A protein has these predicted regions:
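Start-of-repeat signature of ankyrin repeats
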Residues: 7, 40, 73, 106, ...
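Acidic/polar low-complexity surface segments
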Residues: 100-113, 146, 150-161, 194-205, ...
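Conserved ankyrin/ankyrin-like repeat signature
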Residues: 21-22, 54-55, 87-88, 128-129, ...
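Leucine-rich solenoid repeat scaffolds
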Residues: 314-342
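Ankyrin repeat boundary/linker residues
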Residues: 4, 37, 70, 103, ...
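Ankyrin repeat A-helix N-terminal signature
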Residues: 13-19, 46-52, 79-85, 112-113, ...
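Ankyrin-repeat junction/capping positions
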Residues: 1, 34, 67, 100, ...
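Ankyrin repeat domain, specifically the short helix-to-loop turn at the C-terminus of the second helix
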Residues: 24-32, 57-65, 90-98, 131-139, ...
Length: 342
């Protein structure tokens, strides 16, 4: 039970490095199976995170606490899920862990309250593991985090940008299952494809998975969701249409949101073909043309005009007093330069 100077017991070191022989020897000589390191990690947490299945099995047989929890809210199962350790997850579930047990907000402010093993697997791109969780009874319609796993696919596939280019990349994940294939798995396991968000930012309240896929101009995902029964005409709570959010409503920073202008044009054409009203006006007095102005998309402006968007509808001030022209000219909240081409 001697600890290294970092506070790590010898058993934890053996578990972390995947040494079953050393683990057996230490346990047989009285090592405390639930001893904690300096940051309260246990040997089982380390073995689970690093995917050392044989060590995990040895520790469980020796009485390791499968529900040991860090201040972050992470248990051995959450460590295994985050790292995509499918075999370890199988073993922990067989040991009696509830597949739908969420991380509590009190213990982890970094994770969304209500995060479950399923949503954590989806967030990290482990779609085969997520399917394993579905087969073990994970609820595909769980909304304790504020959204379902089907909603999540839109931002997992095409994350909004941040300060660096790395923020634009989807998670590397594990396995060979694609996110589109996983969407079908979700529906096969009972996911409701037209579930609407109950809260969140104003522009996303009431959004369906298809609505959010439109927001990121993800035409391939939009097609998959349509095949699975998505209704493309469902508005959000603000009465915005999928076309409005595809062109830019609710996304006031050009570089910070997913979707290139080419992708937006493809999504917009698809939405018009599906019967979405090009002249829709939301509760804030905004139209698809306002969206194109917010995102500085001159080709989308021309596209809307070519498809007979009525100037008498879109050339009006929204509730903040801005027409699409004024928005493009930089007269909007924030430090925006005029987009002369728009």
């Amino acid at each position: 039970n001697t600890s290294l100077h970092e506070g790590e017991p010898a058993l934890m070191t053996a578990a972390r490095t995947g040494k079953p022989g050393a683990v057996k020897a230490l346990l047989s000589h009285g090592a405390k199976v639930n001893a904690k390191g300096r940051k309260s990690q246990t040997a089982l947490m380390w073995a689970a995170a690093d995917g050392h299945l044989e060590v995990v099995t040895l520790l469980l047989k020796a009485g390791a606490d499968i529900r040991a929890t860090l201040d972050s809210g992470f248990t051995p199962l959450f460590f295994a899920v985050r790292e995509g350790r499918t075999e370890v997850v199988h073993t922990l579930l067989k040991a009696g862990i509830d597949v739908n047990e969420p991380v509590s907000r009190e213990k982890n402010r970094k994770l969304k309250s209500g995060t479950t093993p399923l949503t954590l697997a989806v967030e990290n791109g482990h779609f085969e593991l997520a399917t394993t969780l579905l087969e073990a009874g994970a609820d595909p319609n769980d909304m304790r985090a504020g959204y379902t796993s089907l909603h999540m696919l839109s931002w997992v596939r095409k994350p909004d940008g941040g300060d660096g280019d790395d923020d634009l990349a989807p998670p590397t994940g594990s396995g060979i299952m694609s996110s589109a294939q996983f969407a079908k798995q979700l529906v096969d396991h009972g996911a409701r494809v037209n579930t609407r968000l109950k809260g969140g930012k104003l522009h996303w309240k009431g959004a369906t998975p298809f609505f959010l896929a439109s927001k990121t101009a993800d035409a391939p995902l939009m097609r998959v969701l349509l095949e699975l029964g998505a209704d493309p005409l469902i508005h959000n709570a603000e009465n915005s249409t999928p076309l409005m959010v595809a062109t830019g409503i609710g996304q006031t920073m050009e570089a910070a949101s997913a979707g290139t202008e080419t992708e937006i044009l493809e999504a917009a054409q698809m939405l018009l073909d599906l019967g979405v009203d090009i002249d829709g006006v939301n509760n804030s007095g905004e139209t698809a043309m306002h969206g194109a102005a917010y995102k500085n998309l001159p080709k989308v402006v021309l596209f809307l005009d070519d498809n007979n968007a009525k100037i008498e509808v879109w050339n009006r001030r929204n509730k903040k007093g801005s027409t699409p022209y004024l928005i493009a000219a930089g007269y909007r909240p924030g430090n925006f330069k005029p987009s002369y081409e728009t």
